[in-house]
Amino acid sequence: MALVVQKYGGSSLESAERIRNVAERIVATKKAGNDVVVVCSAMGDTTDELLELAAAVNPVPPAREMDMLLTAGERISNALVAMAIESLGAEAQSFTGSQAGVLTTERHGNARIVDVTPGRVREALDEGKICIVAGFQGVNKETRDVTTLGRGGSDTTAVALAAALNADVCEIYSDVDGVYTADPRIVPNAQKLEKLSFEEMLELAAVGSKILVLRSVEYARAFNVPLRVRSSYSNDPGTLIAGSMEDIPVEEAVLTGVATDKSEAKVTVLGISDKPGEAAKVFRALADAEINIDMVLQNVSSVEDGTTDITFTCPRADGRRAMEILKKLQVQGNWTNVLYDDQVDKVSLVGAGMKSHPGVTAEFMEALRDVNVNIELISTSEIRISVLIREDDLDAAARALHEQFQLGGEDEAVVYAGTGR
């Protein structure tokens, strides 16, 4: 008997009809001879609606109370799914994150999972019940306060539970039926991938793919939890994410896909002193504010005045905070200026085959040249090339790269209505 963990996103649970459909799928999995644990996101746009409601009563709500509010969304869908399962004649028991043993750091709004002790879930499974766990949430062991795991936290909850329960597979259901070679909404002939290594999925998640959040893939790789990305709208087997890139024979290594990211902004510090430790001050201040930095470029030092310019990207959502921090440092460091640009996007090419194909970088640049796309920043890894470009050029760049590396097929991809979650 296999143990299957299934996670359903908000689009899969957005209405009573969708919840009943999900319940039927869950019960069918149980009847096939599996033990089943289900992790639920909040219904549809519930989380966004709760955020708007909070802002209406308090523009700067206390972080603890915000977590108390937001976790209600998952508890609602949790209970409704359990009710729907019971209506089909199967036994179900719902759990909050804390009841399921999800222990976290105490940082409200973006806590990290430190341990999972799913004793009550194991007991319910032993009794033959289907277990329904609220995603996106946990509890801090010291304060006993409810915490949330940040956007995409339900994915991480599902993978963490799968690891703690030694599940055979963790299935992530949304409104897309797998991982594609590109966003089908941008590249119509994008093709679904049957299998990816953890490293390839990590790179895709890190550079913009919204199918899985980065933290969930990191957790899956660390504990070797096989992931399967599937659609709740079809019975397609989806995409399997398992194994290491090192296990792929060199002859079989391929270019995986093109990822796009519309969430970054570019910040440039002009006229900073080109001395040891000056750049460190910039990035330490941002790190202390928990602002993630992605691409970084430092220009050649000016011989005349011993200064340089530093350009980097950060999440657009953190842009205002980053600028406030840097404007204060500008006065102290006597910098020339700090510039902010949110009219930029990022496009990336990912694939294990990049290691064994020396001409990939040249072809990448030539493909963008041919559609008149200018490159502002470049970053690379062993299996990835990313560039920052003007936001108006993103779609053309993605299509050009997809065509250049022959990643498409003859048929157009099937796109279900929804957001990819």
From Swiss-Prot:
State a GO cellular component annotated for this protein: cytosol
**tRNA processing listed as a keyword:** no
Source superkingdom: Bacteria
What is the catalytic activity of this protein? L-aspartate + ATP = 4-phospho-L-aspartate + ADP
Q: How does this chain assemble?
A: Tetramer consisting of 2 isoforms Alpha (catalytic and regulation) and of a homodimer of 2 isoforms Beta (regulation).
Name recorded for this polypeptide: Aspartokinase
**Transmembrane stretches, by residue range?**
none
Residues given in the record as ATP binding sites: 7-10, 41, 174-175, 180-185, 210
Q: How is its activity regulated?
A: Low feedback inhibition by lysine and threonine. The decreased sensitivity of C.flavum, as compared to C.glutamicum, is probably due to the Asp-345-Gly sequence difference.
User: What species is given as this protein's source?
Assistant: Corynebacterium flavescens
